[in-house]
């Protein structure tokens, strides 16, 4: 097959290229109990107090965990419009108390391979593809010879990866070190 023409899209990154990332702190968050064909079960009840990083739901099939991004009070668990599909799915509604109370430990420690993999699993990290495969499963009982860190933006308007690399460089490098430790043989 011979390449006959290259389609090049106009780059519009200048619209956000120099803009710092800003935090949008919502009054409410809605955490869907459905994603990638996985149904989640809430670990909370209405009026429960939630801290940032606290487990709020667990997957039925994969045991993947979902955590709260804010601290506050659970105000409802009912059907809301799910942006990915347009369908109504059960969601946990949490009213933000703006206190940022957290159960997350921000320690910079050197972890062993198995502990890093366990932390990935407990963090509920899944793949961004359609299957939502638990990331920790990719590291268990496997060795790798190469790590590719892809910092390229795939859209002509998007600069979020670029801005993260500029603004959170140390965290990115630390994360790469942890992944390298997790994949070592």
Q: Positions of the model-derived regions?
A:
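Iron-sulfur-associated redox domains of electron-transfer enzymes in respiratory
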Residues: 63-83, 88-185
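Amphipathic, alpha-helical segments enriched in basic
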Residues: 6-8, 25-28, 47, 147, ...
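Intrinsically disordered, low-complexity boundary segments flanking structured domains
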Residues: 15-20, 53, 78-82
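N-terminal alpha-helical targeting/anchoring segments
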Residues: 54, 58-63
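Residue-level marker of beta-strand positions
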Residues: 49, 55, 71-73
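N-terminal start-of-chain detector that recognizes signal peptides
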Residues: 1-6, 13-17, 45-48, 64, ...
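Short histidine-centered loop motifs in beta-beta connectors
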Residues: 40-49, 53
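N-terminal, Lys/Arg-enriched amphipathic/low-complexity engagement segments
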Residues: 1-43, 58, 93
């Amino acid at each position: 097959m011979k390449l006959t023409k290259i389609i090049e899209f106009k780059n519009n990154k200048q619209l956000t290229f120099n803009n710092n990332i800003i935090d949008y702190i919502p009054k409410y968050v809605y955490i869907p109990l459905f994603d990638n064909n996985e149904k989640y079960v809430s670990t909370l009840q209405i009026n429960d107090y939630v801290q940032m990083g606290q487990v709020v739901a667990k997957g039925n099939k994969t045991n993947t965990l979902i955590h709260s991004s804010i601290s506050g009070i659970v105000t409802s668990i009912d059907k809301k419009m799910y942006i990915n599909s347009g369908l109504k799915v059960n969601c946990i509604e949490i009213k933000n108390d703006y206190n940022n109370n957290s159960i997350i430990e921000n320690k910079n420690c050197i972890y062993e391979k198995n502990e890093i993999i366990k932390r990935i699993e407990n963090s509920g990290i899944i793949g961004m593809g359609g299957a939502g495969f638990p990331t920790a499963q990719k590291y268990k009982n496997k060795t790798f010879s190469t790590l590719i860190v892809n910092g390229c933006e795939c859209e002509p308007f998007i600069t979020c990866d670029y801005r993260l690399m500029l603004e959170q460089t140390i965290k990115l490098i630390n994360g790469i070190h942890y992944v390298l430790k997790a994949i070592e043989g």
